[in-house]
Amino acid sequence: MGHYVSLFITSVFIENMALAYFLGMCTFLAVSKKVSTAIGLGVAVVVVMAITVPLNNLLFQFILKDGALAWAGFPDIDLSFLGLLSYIGLIAATVQILEMFLDKFVPSLYNALGVFLPLITVNCAILGGVLFMVERDYNFGESVVYGVGAGFGWALAITALAGIREKLKYSDIPAPLRGLGITFITVGLMSLGFMSFGGMSI
């Protein structure tokens, strides 16, 4: 149990997708203007990562990995070269289902996220989470915890940035730094803050 708690805390704080690896920056910067929208997108990313990382773990372990098809009578087949294509396809299918669900049951959030909901499909934070899972050879349980933790870490970062940007609207910022300029500086300072977790031993 302690191992899973450690993995969760590590994926949220020490190896934060947005502030340690700078993954998913497109939507991270574009949808962080309002806290309500940022929370909505953050929840969507958590749900997608919690589903796609474990599903891609099963896909890798039982179909793509070298010797994975032994259960089907093909022990010598290695389909790992199809990994990237397969992972993106599974992520795209999951996002499409989530988009249809939100359109049907939560139309206000669907309209607020707008074009950025389909962009979750190509959000490199989600693909990065899947690739890290494969590279680190996580089992199914670890991939579930890692998917939830990595998604929660990204959601935490975008919500915090949105809160700061809402406060910055009322600040006297020099004209050349307004907009993305001060946002990049803010993200850099946030990432420095998260670097302090790097020395933690869990």
Swiss-Prot record:
Its EC number is 7.2.1.1. One of its GO terms (molecular function) is oxidoreductase activity, acting on NAD(P)H, quinone or similar compound as acceptor. It is found in: Cell inner membrane. Belongs to the NqrDE/RnfAE family. It is a multi-pass membrane protein. HAMAP family: NqrE (MF_00429). It is an enzyme of class 7 (translocase). One of its GO terms (cellular component) is plasma membrane. One of its GO terms (biological process) is sodium ion transport. It catalyses: a ubiquinone + n Na(+)(in) + NADH + H(+) = a ubiquinol + n Na(+)(out) + NAD(+). InterPro entries: NqrDE/RnfAE, NqrDE/RnfAE_oxidrdctase, NqrE. It comes from the Bacteria. The chain crosses the membrane at residues 5-25, 35-55, 81-101, 114-134, 144-164, 180-200. PANTHER family: INTEGRAL MEMBRANE PROTEIN OF SOXR-REDUCING COMPLEX, NA(+)-TRANSLOCATING NADH-QUINONE REDUCTASE SUBUNIT E. Composed of six subunits; NqrA, NqrB, NqrC, NqrD, NqrE and NqrF. The keyword DNA repair does not apply. NQR complex catalyzes the reduction of ubiquinone-1 to ubiquinol by two successive reactions, coupled with the transport of Na(+) ions from the cytoplasm to the periplasm. NqrA to NqrE are probably involved in the second step, the conversion of ubisemiquinone to ubiquinol. Its main location: membrane. This is Na(+)-translocating NADH-quinone reductase subunit E. The keyword Nucleus does not apply. Keywords: Cell inner membrane, Cell membrane, Ion transport, Membrane, NAD, Sodium, Sodium transport, Translocase, Transmembrane, Transmembrane helix, Transport, Ubiquinone. It comes from Psychrobacter arcticus (strain DSM 17307 / VKM B-2377 / 273-4).
